[in-house]
UniProtKB/Swiss-Prot annotation:
InterPro entries: C2H2-ZF_domain (IPR050752), KRAB (IPR001909), KRAB_dom_sf (IPR036051), Znf_C2H2_sf (IPR036236), Znf_C2H2_type (IPR013087). Belongs to the krueppel C2H2-type zinc-finger protein family. Residues 4-99 form the KRAB domain. The keyword Ribosomal protein does not apply. Its main location: nucleus. CDD domains: KRAB_A-box (cd07765). Keywords: DNA-binding, Metal-binding, Nucleus, Repeat, Transcription, Transcription regulation, Zinc, Zinc-finger. GO terms for molecular function: DNA-binding transcription factor activity, RNA polymerase II-specific; RNA polymerase II transcription regulatory region sequence-specific DNA binding; zinc ion binding. May be involved in transcriptional regulation. This is Zinc finger protein 77.
Amino acid sequence: MDCVIFEEVAVNFTPEEWALLDHAQRSLYRDVMLETCRNLASLDCYIYVRTSGSSSQRDVFGNGISNDEEIVKFTGSDSWSIFGENWRFDNTGDQHQIPQRHLRSQLGRLCESNEGHQCGETLSQTANLLVHKSYPTEAKPSECTKCGKAFENRQRSHTGQRPCKECGQACSCLSCQSPPMKTQTVEKPCNCQDSRTASVTYVKSLSSKKSYECQKCGKAFICPSSFRGHVNSHHGQKTHACKVCGKTFMYYSYLTRHVRTHTGEKPYECKECGKAFSCPSYFREHVRTHTGEKPYECKHCGKSFSCYSSFRDHVRTHTGEKPCQCKHCGKAFTCYSSLREHGRTHSGEKPYECKECGKAFRYPSSLRAHMRMHTGEKPYVCKQCGKAFGCPTYFRRHVKTHSGVKPYQCKECGKAYSFSSSLRIHVRTHTGEKPFECKHCGKAFSCHSSLREHVRTHSGEKPYECNQCGKAFSHAQYFQKHVRSHSGVKPYECTECGKAYSCSSSLRVHVRTHTGERPYECKQCGKTFRYLASLQAHVRTHAGA
């Protein structure tokens, strides 16, 4: 059973605002409140009404509730109960309308009475008066010093100010004061010293809808409790703790969802496929996979989404907004999931483990790509040349090689590259920078992939195994070269003479016979060579001398 605070579903007015409403608008208010209560009753919900000064209170099941809350429980078509005491009415007319008519008359008398507005009480206290009717005769509710009217909650004053929920001092917080009835925006800074709602913008329109706008990020809320929870998120306050593992949450709904991870409860089941979910929002999103519904449409490009979070993250690609910032390095991201994955680069966490070889990965996509090495699956096929890839990143890089576009050019030598990462690695050949150092032997590399392959010489790991002969390799390029020895494929062809090779390095060496390039120079005598092996043999002649 869910619990609902009355203020979350009620619409409050000050006496001045209520006086501006005509009879039709007041009737509309009563109808809305009655419909809300009826809907909550049909959902078997508790309605909590905040009060003050109550000592030990019990709900309708005899369970204790907090000292500053009272509980109203609407239980049926011809009665409702308050603190377990049932109110029954004459069984005349439509059974389902009796309690609503009675509540309507209560609201009507209280709302339209002149006495009810002399002391500045808002309509949210109508519920307090209804609850008060169920108290024993010896209960002594507080009495208003100006008009003599009795209320259980006596903390609201005739000044229009109400006590701050944090410190008890009178202030003009968003939940304590309402602006005039005309549509406007009014700054209401809180006067108390310890308030998280230090400065908010409170907007009220003639439709009686309230919008609580966060001064920090501009996000607006209709429900005050949702707004307060949002403000807490800026301050990092997590007041709801899990009794099982101690994890804390900003919102009670998040805690409820988390608890189900311990209990395994999945109350939301899809009627189409039987899949069950612990969270209603995940369930709703899943249902849309069956219906095809995509209610969230981007105003910038017209793209539609079935999931609000995907829609929100997409919109940020247009606005450039990156609200999720890393606390370690300051890098910002458009969505929390990207920030979470980035955080693993700092923590070193690798939660995704291969069941075949035990290797762990930081990202699920990396694990999927790795698994294809075991299965041999290569689902990404190039339409131009038919080459297949197991990793989407390598596939995208390969596709760009067909376009011939090389937008990244080296300022030192003019050499151009298709990828910015390739240019960065190349630039290090000019600067001599080698930021990747082996922890075992201290050898440094300009490229991380080179370090990764080097580390395997220490660990003895050979993850690349030939399916045909079982031979294993520590380097991907050696493995690919070996596989071509079985297939006879020679994809690297010289444009000058047409000679083909099974690996790109062999083609590069061959091309030097046409260009005359001799990139390997002896530092002692200045002699140049076409091949690295030739230079190494030459250097030995100096050492022997």
